[in-house]
């Protein structure tokens, strides 16, 4: 509970002129050797009606003098007790400190307010369970180099403590302390200063690290390489430039910039590079599957004109990185056919499928290229894009008519027949009669013989009429160019039909006429 006097003192802002020194002393508004005290606003006081001080500044002075009455008044006026403790320490007024110690949770909280090293150490000593390492840690935190200098002997002996404090100085970015520790005692490993500088993006500390490193006479190339890799990977241009002052290979920087898509870094160095080096970086960008913006940047420095096309295509296929092709395509530079040709010629069907999907290439186009390169495996695998077997047969059959060279047609016919042979019995029956006519038209004797055998295995009641009609239809298809083997197959089946006595008189006459036609063609063939 506040007394009436305390309430008056707390809220009295204007002192009447009639108040003399005696009245002010009775009210507790008089500071011995200083004069009357008057509150101004929330943060300041007026002494003797002519000197203005902050409440906390006045608290320090009053506590240093050991004037607890004034301290209590200033605390009523919302002063900070921490400043009273600081003042008491400066004046060695420990009785005053003990008066308020129950109100202090942790003396470490007062340390940031202290500028003087001796007072800092005295304040830390009030925390009963703290030792020298704790003091030194807080000295670094609050940049109190004189305290560290005082305990230099101990730091010489305690190597682990010295290394720990050096790391803390890095974390809290205390450059003077870092310099002092390294120059007076040395630390085991300076890598920590670089690692923390990079993580905090602190270029000043990074530069200091090199000053300390080269003061030792250390010019280790591997360390420069590591720093270039790390800083370039993070896209830290100014750190890269700082490192390059001391040496290192710029190619490391460029490789990392491409790998991690740091265009600002790339743009800075690309203008200094010859064309052949930029082309190498483009290949690396394809290998690393760089972003569209990175590829565009590299291509723009090449004016979207790539001279090493073959090598570029090899990288596109090998690393399944087709974005560069799509970018060039937008610039009306079409490399899709070249990519497809190279992929089909040299790579597996899996790689072909990946390229086909990424570049949205029509499967018919892939199959035609595969036929041209005699890649049966790719033809078969690509045809699986049509899941329905009957659809696959129809599409491949239609493609036969578009192929001009004979060896390609023969290869595709074998693929078609392979698909047919793997069909289920019911599915075979749906296509066999159509395929038979197709095989005759394409002079595929082996396939025609197989399909005729399959026809003969059908149910007799259903087989005879359809097979008879098939043979009659086939006789209409044959020409002078029809191969001898097909003619012999037809001849045998016509004779079989006569033997089975399943032909009408008109059909017999037609059969004899057609048989004569077959024999005539055979004679011509001989």
UniProtKB/Swiss-Prot annotation:
Keyword entries, A-Z = Late protein
Supply the induction statement: Expressed in the late phase of the viral replicative cycle.
Keyword Zinc tagged:
no
Function statement: Plays a role in virus cell tropism, and may be required for efficient virus replication in macrophages.
Q: Which domain of life is it from?
A: Viruses
The entry assigns this protein to a family as follows:
Belongs to the asfivirus MGF 505 family.
According to UniProt, the name of this protein is Protein MGF 505-2R
Organism from which the protein derives? African swine fever virus (isolate Pig/Kenya/KEN-50/1950)
């Amino acid at each position: 509970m506040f007394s009436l006097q305390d309430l008056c003192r707390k809220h009295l802002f204007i002192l009447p002129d009639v108040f003399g020194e005696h009245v002010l002393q009775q009210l507790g508004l008089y500071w011995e050797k200083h004069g009357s005290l008057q509150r101004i606003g929330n943060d300041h006081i007026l002494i003797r009606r002519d000197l203005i001080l902050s409440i906390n500044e006045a608290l320090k002075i009053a506590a240093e003098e050991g004037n607890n009455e004034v301290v209590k008044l200033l605390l009523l006026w919302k002063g900070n007790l921490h400043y009273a403790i600081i003042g008491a320490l400066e004046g060695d007024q420990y009785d005053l400190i003990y008066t308020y110690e129950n109100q202090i949770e942790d003396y470490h909280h007062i340390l940031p307010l202290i500028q003087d090293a001796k007072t800092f150490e005295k304040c830390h000593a009030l925390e009963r369970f703290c030792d020298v390492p704790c003091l030194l840690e807080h000295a670094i935190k609050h940049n109190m180099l004189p305290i560290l200098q005082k305990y230099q002997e101990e730091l010489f002996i305690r190597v682990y403590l010295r290394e720990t404090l050096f790391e803390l100085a890095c974390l809290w970015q205390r450059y003077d302390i870092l310099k002092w520790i390294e120059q007076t005692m040395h630390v085991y490993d300076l890598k920590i200063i670089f690692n923390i500088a990079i993580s905090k993006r602190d270029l000043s500390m990074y530069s200091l690290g090199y000053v300390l490193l080269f003061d030792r006479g250390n010019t280790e190339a591997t360390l420069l390489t590591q720093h270039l890799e790390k800083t370039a990977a993070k896209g830290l241009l100014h750190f890269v430039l700082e490192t390059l002052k001391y040496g290192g290979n710029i190619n490391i920087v460029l490789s990392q910039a491409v790998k991690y898509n740091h265009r600002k870094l790339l743009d800075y160095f690309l203008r200094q590079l010859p064309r052949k080096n930029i082309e190498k970086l483009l290949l690396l960008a394809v290998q690393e599957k760089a972003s569209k913006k990175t590829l565009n940047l590299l291509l723009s420095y090449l004016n979207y004109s790539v001279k090493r096309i073959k090598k570029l295509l090899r990288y596109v296929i090998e690393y399944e990185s087709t974005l560069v092709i799509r970018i060039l395509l937008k610039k009306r530079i079409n490399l899709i056919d070249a990519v497809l040709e190279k992929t089909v010629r040299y790579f597996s069907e899996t790689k072909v499928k990946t390229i086909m999907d990424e570049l949205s290439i029509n499967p018919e186009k892939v199959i035609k290229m595969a036929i041209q390169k005699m890649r049966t495996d790719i033809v078969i695998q690509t045809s699986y894009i049509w899941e329905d077997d009957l659809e696959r047969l129809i599409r491949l059959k239609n493609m036969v008519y578009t192929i001009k060279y004979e060896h390609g047609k023969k290869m595709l016919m074998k693929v078609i027949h392979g698909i047919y042979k793997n069909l289920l019995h019911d599915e075979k029956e749906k296509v066999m009669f159509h395929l038979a006519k197709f095989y005759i038209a394409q002079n595929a004797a082996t396939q025609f013989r197989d399909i005729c055998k399959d026809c003969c295995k059908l149910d007799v009641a259903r087989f005879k009429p359809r097979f008879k009609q098939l043979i009659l239809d086939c006789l209409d298809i044959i020409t002078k160019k029809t191969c001898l083997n097909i003619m012999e197959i037809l001849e045998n089946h016509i004779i079989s039909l006569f033997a089975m006595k399943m032909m009408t008189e008109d059909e017999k006459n037609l059969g004899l006429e057609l048989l004569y036609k077959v024999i005539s063609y055979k004679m011509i063939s001989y």
